[in-house]
Amino acid sequence: MTRNHPALRKATSNADLYSDPSPPRPLRHSSSVVLGRAHTTASLPYMQRPDRAGPGRAWRVREGTSDLSNRHSVAASYPDLMQAYDDYPPPARQQNPPPVPPKIPEVPAEQPEKEAEAPRPVSSHCWIPVPALAKEDPASYTKPFTDYMTNNPTIFHAVDAVAKDLEKNGYKKLSERDAWELKAGGKYYVERNGTALIAFAVGDKYASGNGAAIVAGHIDALTAKLKPIPTLRTKAGYVQLGVAPYAGALSDTWWDRDLGIGGRVLVKENGKIVTKLVKLDWPIAKIPTLAPHFGAAANGPFNKETQMVPIIGLDNSDLGASSSENVEEFKASVLGGEGAFASTQPQRLVKAISKELGITDYSTIVNWELELFDTQPARTGGLDKEFIFAGRIDDKLCSWAAVQALLNSSSTLSSSSQIRMVALFDDEEVGSLLRQGARGNFLPSIIERIAEEFAPSGKTSSALSRTYANSFLVSSDVIHAVNPNFLNAYLENHSPRLNMGPAVSADPNAHMTTDAVSTAILQRCVDRDVGVRKMDPKLQVFQIRNDSRSGGTVGPMLSAATGIRAIDCGIPQLSMHSIRATTGSLDPGLGVFTFQSFLENFESVDQEFK
């Protein structure tokens, strides 16, 4: 530091030093900060060195050393300043109380530390107060989650967005068709059918037979899918679209909603079949209700095949009005004529999708899988923005939180001797029976290939068995949050609340994997990080009443197929299976914290249970 340094330009009197400190300036994110005014003047009074200062209150500065491991570190040597400090003669008698160091506010950190760093050994030149690192706030995950929900309305978009996020963070895509070359410290992911994904990170100290910490859930959601040939005859001037409900879709909550269309389109390009994602995110379809004036007919029950058919346009050509559709002309324009896929689809829909994807030759469209979705974006709500209102929360919520937790845990991978894994399955809402579902071989095959890659020659079978035995699975599916209008539907003391943390789901009839041991393991993992963040997630408990039926999760089928210990734990939400549901605005972040604590702490916690 030179004499012209801004910190030395203004001399400070003793009266200034012992007066109330002025409001400090915010620290800059750099390798050095401007020292407090009371400690950086050209004429320094004698100050007794507070050798008994408590840890965290002040650190001494090593002359000529810069603390590069801390974003808020103090600058290096100031020989002139230090010499002035040491040479200043002490007064005969202390007349005033010792100066009060200026209060330095917390500075938000980009990547908060998990544990407080111990004071470093330094010279005795002076003491400088060091600010505490800002703690991670669950609210920081609210907007990223709502953006993800709005931008990825179909399962194809959701999985694709996860894959892109993984690649941005150093994960390498593997193909099940190819041979793998895995290494300790590596990060990888595998897709199946474009609707299921497994990502895993190998600890730097991983050895064959070691366990895996796994968070598994499903990324599919209730929707209405277009039928293979969705073209319908015009009724009373309305153009309608043939759709079929996926799981419990087309319920009463689907009436009068603004519905867009999206999914994946297979296109022939340069002799190859490529997949393109499409999203028509403006209101296209509507399922209109019958006005209550018509009496009993408006009250239902309703036939999903004949009375819940979306309208997508008008065609009054039967009354002499001009029509934008000429079926024969359209078929003739498609190369291949009636045999081409596009000729079997609503022509205005074909044109809209082709325009969105830049397709000029309709005959290059080989096939597609499209579905309806609510176009209303995910939003925060409530007087203090305590809620998130969105579609498809079940279960994009736990899936997204699990992936973020895996990405966050990369910073501690170098000290791990285990596998950290997130598995997102399709078809959970309809029984998980397909190859991309949890009843398929997707998860076992990935773990088997990892075991084979690291196992010594001839020891593959033993390594796989030990891997399963040393692993633990958190089956993460959303949980019913308590509804204040229907309290009698919930079991007392087993009713999770929003913005408190995930809930452990129990069921005495084996619909869930939770037991006393698995609950204790997860609780210990969460307890390890108490106080690290701005808000600690609280593990809540859910169980249905004896007079209610339970849903299911991927947990029991995965645990039974592999022998892996497991627990069911998910994030609470209201209005499950509605087209528009609710969760807490802090719940995505609290879910991330819970899953991250499990991924990072299971290895050490498991030692307590051996």
Q: What would you call each of these model-derived segments?
A:
Residues 2-4, 10-11, 16, 20-93, ...:
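N-terminal hydrophobic/helix-forming segments and targeting peptides
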